[in-house]
């Protein structure tokens, strides 16, 4: 048994505290909140909190349940948001990072992007998940105005991570159901970068016959491709799990490609452990698996 002198013990204790303080970063989630189901804010908040980052939220919409049930009620909170930002500014609230997800309207996008642009000037990192569609189709209610709104969000992003469908709509690129080549994937990333985002990932993309996530890291100028094995089941909220784990590791100063792979591995484990669940529409019970992150 090692017995340390009091001064040495205090030194080690203070070093430990300092490491934790340096690691902790405050993040604001601007996304919708579902009353029933682990998606969007309800999926991201417990993960980021578990990873040690104080997490705050601003709902862009209140949704009764996940949309996968086919019936839902939704409340657009744009009017509420317009009153929040002036109060926060008066109180001096600041965040190390902001993550945006579902945006309810073009008006809301303008308000949120203006706030993000203002915060970015103060050193805040902006993450944008341009939620609009999947499997070649836009979600119900998504219009050309929505796409333009998301382009406005990308203009202030340090990192965006659309899926393949969303990347195609954002860049006016034809969607290919059978997948694309690596050169075509890199061209998509270049187009996203041209819209304004510094770095970019594209998820749920088939590259040369392999399910992959592709990325561009503006800090190094590197492109990368990370293949994965697909589990043929669908859960709502897996993209939000990916986003939360990815952002959590990036806030811990992990390199983009490494953080992406870690997020992919967590999503795979979560899906694999829940693939036999009867009611998949409510998402994955995240709190049961936080120790796997």
PLM regions: where:
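Hydrophobic alpha-helical signal peptides and transmembrane signal-/tail-anchor segments
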Residues: 3-17
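Conserved N-terminal subdomain of the carbohydrate kinase-like
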Residues: 23-128, 132-140, 287-292
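Short pre-catalytic strand/loop immediately N-terminal to key active-site residues, enriched for Gly-Thr
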Residues: 35, 223-236
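Conserved phosphate/ATP/ADP-binding segment of small-molecule kinases
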Residues: 141-223
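Short, small-residue alpha-helix embedded
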Residues: 169, 233-256, 260
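Short, charged, surface-exposed loops that flank catalytic or proteolytic processing sites
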Residues: 175-184, 251-261
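Charged C-terminal helix
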Residues: 257-293
């Amino acid at each position: 048994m090692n017995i340390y002198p009091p001064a040495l013990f205090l030194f080690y204790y203070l070093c430990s505290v300092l490491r934790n303080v340096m690691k902790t970063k405050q993040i604001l989630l601007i996304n919708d909140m579902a009353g029933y189901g682990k998606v969007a804010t309800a999926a991201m908040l417990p993960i980021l909190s578990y990873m040690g980052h104080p997490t705050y939220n601003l709902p862009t919409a209140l949704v009764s349940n996940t949309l996968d049930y086919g019936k839902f009620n939704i409340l657009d909170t744009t009017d509420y948001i317009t009153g929040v930002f002036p109060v926060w500014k008066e109180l001096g609230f600041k965040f190390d990072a902001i993550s945006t997800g579902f945006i309810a309207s073009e008006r809301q996008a303008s308000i949120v992007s203006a706030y993000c642009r203002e915060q970015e000037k103060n050193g805040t990192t902006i993450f944008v998940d341009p939620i609009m569609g999947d499997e070649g189709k836009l979600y119900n209610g998504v219009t050309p105005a929505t796409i333009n709104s998301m382009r406005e969000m990308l203009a202030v992003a340090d990192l965006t991570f659309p899926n393949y469908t969303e990347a195609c709509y954002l860049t006016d690129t034809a969607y290919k159901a059978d997948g694309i080549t690596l050169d075509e994937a890199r061209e998509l990333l270049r187009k996203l970068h041209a819209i304004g985002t510094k770095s970019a990932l594209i998820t749920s993309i088939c590259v040369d016959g392999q399910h992959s996530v592709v990325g561009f890291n503006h800090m190094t100028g590197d492109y990368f491709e990370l293949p994965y094995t697909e589990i043929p089941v669908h859960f709502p909220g897996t993209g939000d799990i990916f986003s939360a784990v990815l952002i959590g590791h990036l806030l811990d100063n992990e390199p983009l490609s490494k953080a992406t792979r870690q997020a992919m591995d967590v999503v795979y484990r979560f899906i694999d452990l829940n693939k036999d669940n009867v009611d998949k529409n409510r998402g994955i019970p995240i709190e049961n698996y936080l120790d796997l992150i």
